[in-house]
Amino acid sequence: MTNTTSNEIKQLDSDYIAQTYGRFNLVLSHGKGCQVWDFEGNEYLDFTSGIGVNSLGWTDEDWLKAVVHQASSLAHTSNLFFTEPSSRLAKKLAEVSGLKRVFFANSGAEANEGAIKTARKYSHDKYGKDRATVLTLVNSFHGRTISTLSATGQEVFHQHFFPFTKGFDHTPANELRALETRLGQKDVCAIILEVVQGEGGVCSLDHEYLQGVQALCHQYDVLLIIDEVQTGIGRTGTMFAYQQFGLTPDIITLAKGLGGGLPIGAFVLGEKVQDTLGKSDHGSTFGANPVSCAGANAVLAKIDDTFLAEVKRKGEKLQKALAALPKVKSVSGLGLMIGVEFEEGTKAADIVAKCIEKGVLFLTAKTKLRLLPPLIINDEQIEKGIAVLKEVLEA
């Protein structure tokens, strides 16, 4: 395999992998910190972190040590046995969230599915079967399974896959009156929302709206589920984004940055629903995988108050620098989860392609440029990324 060329890998992909991804024209070989290299030895500064997954960058030494040690001793057991990594990880997640119990899955979509099941069972146990609707927000994204796609509030994803799962409805973001009117129908068991809508264009919800949502949830005994798949684990400058808005969710969902590069998802249950799921109500063969949990424990061990303060500082620095660039109309987001809207005529996808040619990797979200750098990115790397972006925008 060491003599394989980029073109050979691309051809194998074309021949044998389902063509569901619009890939960058790069074949990556290895990475370290905030840099990655392709098969030809070209170096790139990474502002994508695997779409917010590599929170500690590429091949962090402590993370790698924990993962290799666990893989060499106990890689998989199923959930018929107790394991140390999952137990310790669950305790840590309960402590940092203020919630009570954790169910481990393998992805954000799985975590959201589990949260939805929990909400419906809670409502069924308390009110009966006619109170099962889950509300989500217009412009939201919650996954690509049939149920989480049904929950997603973007028509662009609602093509070709009919019929969708019943029991979901969408309400406009930042419109409390519309939400209260919908809750008045008395058929809703939960609302699930992202504090910052990532795939929807890095759009932050209003503080007043979020406070109002929480109050309405209390009034109608509707569960508040916060999707922290992209915003969680330090991405926004606090461990979880909801902590910046004075919210107390009943359930949060996690994935992406939790594993530091390995697949893992989780939903964390608050006191009201901590005992809702009983034996055989939910399950996952690969959930709580010891290796993934060991990686997640290594990630959480590094995210302390000092680390989070640096994420916030670097995010503010990056947003300020981005706002000063030519052709930039607006900058949105929290911490190191940032969206850049360009003036009319400047396409984010074109900017990303030109930046790749100059050795810097960015993402898009709808029509915006999206930045999700490793949380360990330093000031010099931020300045380099801004310089390249400025050069491209001025060309």
Regions found by a protein language model. Name each.
Residues T2-A395:
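Conserved N-terminal phosphate-binding loop of PLP-dependent enzymes in the Aspartate aminotransferase
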